[in-house]
Amino acid sequence: MENISLYVCSYNVEKTIEEVIIGILNLDPKPNEIIIVNDGSTKKNNLVFKKMSHLKKIEVLNLRKNVKAQIAIATGLNFLKKEKFQGGIIVMDADGQDDPEYLIDIFKESKKNPERTITINRTKRDDELPFKILYQMYLFLSFLLTFKYLKFGVYSYLHSSSLDKILSTNDIHLAYAASLAKHFKNKNVIFAPRKKRILGESQNNYKSLTHYALKIISVFRNQVLINSIVLVFISFLLSKLITSSALFLFILLALLFFNVIIFLLAYQINKSHVVNDTLKNIENIENLRNELL
């Protein structure tokens, strides 16, 4: 099997990440190395793992401050680029919702074409009905404005040869999954249900999820602007047919406001000092494998 680096993003989830990593170490085949990005956790990690003889290394990148998942992912990928890593890279979250058992499917799929990006598309979500309704509305709106149907999250595979491309813009700091969809048109897909969190409840609320949805769409802001102009033109023609300008004015103002929001989000990210050099936010690197030798 080609050299595979597994990259796990974590924040205050020592218990869950321990279960996730143990599950990974019990797989056959296994990744060659594991990199855990500790996104400024306030709780101290005391991770110790067995069955590590096959691993080249298992490292923890401790970030100075919490920068949230998307920038933490970018930090890890920049680190792999700096280290001149060659091979496949698997990105997953540490909350247990990304099922480690599907790593076997990723390994098999990556053998067919190691340089082809792979996404893990979710087939089932255990969410409350209001959230499911809002999620479907978001999928419809995002498809209408971007022509992208995004049913995958951070759980994915990409090759080291793709690092320059995905890190060429700041889009990855807005939304990693959307950046994959934007930069890599041809992707292989693996379908998998989204598991429940191992411990605790998600700290995301409707406000934070709405903010994240806007950041996802802002990755495609230029396409959204073009599609918005087309929609405004169509609404103008419709308003002439029904002899009413209310529909036209509503769509015009709504899309104008929406475009201002997503362009402002992108502007804020581009001007943020945090994303200018994410590697400076790495406080230290722990080698867990060395601690066991």
Residue ranges and their predicted role:
Residues 1-23:
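N-proximal low-complexity "stem/linker" segments adjacent to membrane-targeting elements
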Residues 22-31:
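Short, acidic, metal-binding catalytic loop of nucleotide-sugar glycosyltransferases
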Residues 31-41, 61-62:
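Short beta-strand/loop segment that forms part of the nucleotide-sugar
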Residues 38-47, 96-97:
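A conserved acidic beta->alpha catalytic loop
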Residues 164-223:
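Catalytic donor/gating beta->alpha subdomain of glycosyltransferases that bind UDP-sugars
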